[in-house]
Swiss-Prot record:
UniProtKB keywords: Hydrolase, Manganese
PANTHER family the record matches: ADENINE DEAMINASE, N-ACETYLGLUCOSAMINE-6-PHOSPHATE DEACETYLASE
Protein name: Adenine deaminase 2
Organism: Carboxydothermus hydrogenoformans (strain ATCC BAA-161 / DSM 6008 / Z-2901)
Family to which the UniProt record says this protein belongs: Belongs to the metallo-dependent hydrolases superfamily. Adenine deaminase family.
The gene coding this protein: ade2
EC number: 3.5.4.2
Domain of life from the UniProt record: Bacteria
Keyword Hydrolase: yes
Biological process annotations from GO: adenine catabolic process
InterPro entries (alphabetical): Adenine_deam, Adenine_deam_C, Amidohydro-rel, Metal-dep_hydrolase_composite, Metal_Hydrolase
């Protein structure tokens, strides 16, 4: 309960505050002004701004004070670390509230994954709220580890940290009023529904919004953003590791629309979290691009709080939670002090807290693969022409190529000369024995194999290799370590990064994970993989059958334009 008696008495100056930040330039989220004065805090809440005395004081000597930043949509799993370690990265960067979608771990572990995320993200000096995964499995052309219907989601919808339904990717299900989709919308009625519908417009967009969808984070152009804003949606401006849209969308933010715009990172990988930070990086980018500073700060704070109905967050004002950032300048946006509920939790970029033990047994031991049958790795050739997945530098979309490929004994074979490697996806959740096999062009791999259990959206095991023997060796290594990333050559494991939590997250620190990632990248480069590709990010999206043009799942080669499985051989 809010300590009303204490708040009133401190606000009136009848008793000292627990904490006073003196001589600050305080950002007012409502007027966009910086006002010189003190900030008084009692029992984790702001009692007032002005002139106050307290038991503990910090003389800020004119430093700038803002509310804690809010990330409106992020997948913790993309950081490859557990929630507590994720918090240790976000909090020093100034993000004190994150709205997460546990879509990735739910695809592996179902309701156990959601329960783990709720438990592992509690009792941390950061507000972590959940949006329930709306599309598990994401498509019918892959095998996920779980199926989440409206019935499963109803178990969580009234949890105090569950705010609604996560990104509604299945917009055809909405537009065609599929029965199960209508049930999910009914279960979450009265809660928020986040959108995910790039490219649709006109009456289809209108119908999608009419179903109850409130926001969109997939816009890539200002025109697309304006159409959504004009129809009442909130706009999430995204700057992730894989997809960066902030600068393209800023022109859609003006004095009429700004209050319905806020920032999200969606996916931030370890290197970016360490080097760039979180929402503070987006604030810096936007201001550097010429955006109005007060508007940008509102987008990082009060706008997101209002959208998510978190009415005690996003402002330095009486009765609000004392989630406070202190900056020495407004160029770099690196907080000197970070206060959560009035307690100092980070200083000069360093967290002042650790995690706590969490029972994660329900999301470990997720490598449920049948014994590998080498025959399943053979690709029959009716001719010497094949459908080949063509990689595009710095893109997650691929090209649908038709190439001449070497054939031996009636089967397609890899070719270093033609830069053609074999790609395989092994189902790893249900012991089905499913293996999808195809060919890719452009990776540059000369020998060996690289493999990962981070493979959107179902997170099966994906491996690219030049020989079946190394592909099998890579699979066996990932089984041994409980999931993760590995590189193999000549039957020898050259390096691995264990991700034992659902095959998606490490139980080690962010810095340790990044160090191992860098080692793996160096090894992969030595095997010939081009600098144009982040090898494991590339692998992670090669099995996502909703991103054009050709993808591979455990069920086979998918032509995204027809949403069907097609043979490799032409």
């Amino acid at each position: 309960m809010k300590p009303i008696k204490d708040l009133v008495e401190v606000a009136l100056g009848k008793k000292p505050a627990d904490l006073v930040l003196k001589n600050a330039q305080v950002f007012n989220s409502f007027t966009g002004e910086f006002v010189t004065g003190d900030v008084a805090v009692v029992a984790g809440y702001i009692a007032g701004t002005g002139e106050y005395e307290g038991k503990t004081t910090y003389d800020l000597q004119g430093a700038y004070v803002t509310p804690g930043f809010i990330d409106g949509h992020v997948h913790i799993e993309s950081s490859m670390v557990a929630p507590a370690e994720f918090a240790r990265a976000l909090v020093p960067a100034g993000t004190l509230t994150a709205v997460v979608d546990p879509h990735e771990i739910a695809n592996v572990s179902g309701t156990a994954g959601i329960r783990y995320m709720l438990e592992a993200s509690s009792n941390l000096p950061i507000n972590i709220y959940l949006m329930l995964p709306s599309c598990v499995p994401a498509t019918s052309l892959e095998t996920a580890g779980a199926v989440l219907t409206a019935r499963e989601l109803s178990e969580f919808i009234n949890h105090p940290r569950v705010l609604g339904l996560g990104e509604l990717m299945d917009y055809p299900g909405v537009l065609n009023t599929h029965e199960e989709m209508l049930k999910k919308l009914a279960v979450t009625e009265g809660k928020l529904i986040d959108g995910h519908a790039p490219g649709i417009s006109g009456k289809e967009l209108t119908a999608y919004i009419a179903a109850g969808v409130n926001s969109e984070h997939e816009c890539t152009t200002a025109e697309e953003a304006r159409e959504r804003l004009s129809r009442g949606m909130y706009l999430m401006l995204r700057e992730g590791s894989a997809t960066k849209n902030l600068l393209d969308l800023l022109p859609a933010v003006d004095r009429y629309t700004a209050s319905r715009c806020f920032f999200v990172t969606d996916d931030r990988h370890p290197e970016d979290l360490i080097k760039l930070g979180s929402i503070n990086h987006m604030v810096k980018l936007a201001v550097s691009a010429g955006a109005d500073l007060p508007t940008v700060l509102q987008m990082a704070t009060i706008n997101a709080a209002n959208y998510f109905r978190l009415y005690d967050l996003g402002a330095i004002a009486p009765g609000y939670r004392a989630d406070i950032l202190v900056f020495e300048d407004l160029q770099e946006f690196k907080p000197k002090y970070v206060f959560k509920d009035g307690k100092l939790v980070a200083e000069n970029g360093k967290p002042l807290f650790t995690g706590y033990p969490v029972d994660d047994r329900a999301v470990r031991n997720t490598m449920r693969l049948k014994e590998i049958n080498p025959e399943k790795l053979k690709i029959p050739a009716k001719s010497n022409r094949a459908r080949v997945i063509g990689l595009i530098p710095h893109q997650i979309v691929t090209k649908k190529l038709e190439l001449e490929v070497p054939v031996e004994g009636g089967y397609f074979k890899t070719s270093t000369e033609k830069d053609i490697a074999k790609l395989a996806v092994f189902e790893r959740h249900n012991y089905t024995g499913n293996v999808g096999v195809g060919l890719i062009h452009g990776l540059g791999l000369k020998k060996g194999a690289i493999a990962s259990t981070v493979a959107h959206d179902s997170h099966n095991l994906v491996v690219a290799g030049m020989s079946d023997e190394d592909i099998i060796a890579a699979v066996e290594e990932l089984k041994r370590i409980g999931g993760g990333l590995t590189v193999v050559a000549d039957g020898q494991v050259l390096g691995s990064l264990p991700l034992p939590i659902a095959g998606l997250m490490s139980d080690r620190t962010l810095y340790e994970v990044q160090e191992e990632l860098e080692k793996l990248h160096r090894i992969v480069r030595n095997l010939g993989v081009s600098e144009n590709y982040d090898p494991f990010m590339t692998l992670a999206f090669l099995s996502l059958p909703v991103i054009p043009e050709l993808k591979l799942t455990d069920l086979g080669l998918v032509d995204v334009s027809t949403f069907s499985v097609v043979p490799v051989s032409l």
